[in-house]
């Protein structure tokens, strides 16, 4: 079984290091840590690695967050994957900074990126990794998720990304529950 890790974010330098782009940042860490390079297709950038005999595909959409679903179903056929191979990495304003929640399957979400994906797929039956970006102390959630991290927050997240980059690439059906326990109990 392969794994397709889809990191959510918004394209463009103006969005780098924002709370909404933690999915992109984690994938960038996995790419650099494994000496990989991103290749470009029409709607996304991707990289591929092998872990033992499993293929792991890393994908960063070139669409804005709210249009993430437009990658499907073509991305599945491009890499010979299906919904059970999908792991979406995204921000979560309800989790404290440095805390994660890995879920095997999920219900509908208020996150617009997930709404877009679930709407196109006709299902929310895929895995997700929520990365806490801190509590929303501002009234306007859009302003909050598009705000940049401060230096101390970036330092904490770098440690988290380092940890997650090792944990995610060898995730499988047989060790998923162990990974949930390890990732969900971590705090950076």
Curated annotation (Swiss-Prot):
Signal peptide positions on this chain: none
GO cellular component: cytoplasm
EC number: 3.1.1.29
SUPFAM superfamilies: Peptidyl-tRNA hydrolase-like
Catalytic site: 20 (proton acceptor)
Keyword DNA-binding part of the UniProt annotation: no
Residues flagged as site, Discriminates between blocked and unblocked aminoacyl-tRNA: 10
Top EC class of this enzyme: hydrolase
UniProt catalytic activity: an N-acyl-L-alpha-aminoacyl-tRNA + H2O = an N-acyl-L-amino acid + a tRNA + H(+)
One Pfam family in the UniProt entry: Pept_tRNA_hydro
Keyword tRNA-binding on entry: yes
PROSITE patterns: PEPT_TRNA_HYDROL_1, PEPT_TRNA_HYDROL_2
Binding site for tRNA: 15, 64, 66, 112
Stabilizes the basic form of H active site to accept a proton, annotated site positions: 91
Cellular localization per UniProt: Cytoplasm
One Gene Ontology biological process: rescue of stalled ribosome
Protein keywords: Cytoplasm, Hydrolase, RNA-binding, tRNA-binding
Molecular function terms, GO-annotated: peptidyl-tRNA hydrolase activity; tRNA binding
General function of this protein: Hydrolyzes ribosome-free peptidyl-tRNAs (with 1 or more amino acids incorporated), which drop off the ribosome during protein synthesis, or as a result of ribosome stalling.
Subunit structure: Monomer.
Family (UniProt): Belongs to the PTH family.
Listed name of the protein: Peptidyl-tRNA hydrolase
């Amino acid at each position: 079984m392969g794994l397709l890790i889809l990191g959510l974010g918004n394209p463009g330098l103006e969005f780098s290091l924002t709370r909404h782009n933690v999915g992109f940042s984690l994938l960038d860490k996995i790419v650099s840590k494994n000496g990989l390079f991103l290749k470009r297709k029409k709607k996304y950038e991707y990289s591929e690695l092998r872990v033992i005999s499993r293929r792991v595909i890393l994908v960063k959409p070139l669409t804005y967050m709210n249009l993430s679903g437009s990658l499907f179903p073509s991305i599945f056929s491009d890499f010979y994957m299906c919904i059970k191979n999908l792991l979406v990495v995204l921000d979560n304003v309800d989790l404290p900074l440095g805390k994660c929640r890995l879920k095997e399957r999920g219900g509908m979400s208020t996150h617009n990126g997930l709404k877009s994906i679930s709407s196109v797929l006709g299902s929310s039956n895929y895995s997700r990794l929520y990365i806490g970006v801190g509590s929303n102390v501002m009234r306007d959630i859009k302003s909050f998720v598009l705000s940049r991290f401060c230096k101390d927050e970036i330092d904490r997240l770098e440690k988290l990304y380092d940890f997650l980059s090792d944990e995610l690439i060898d995730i499988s059906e047989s060790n998923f529950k162990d990974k949930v326990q390890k990732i969900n109990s971590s705090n950076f």
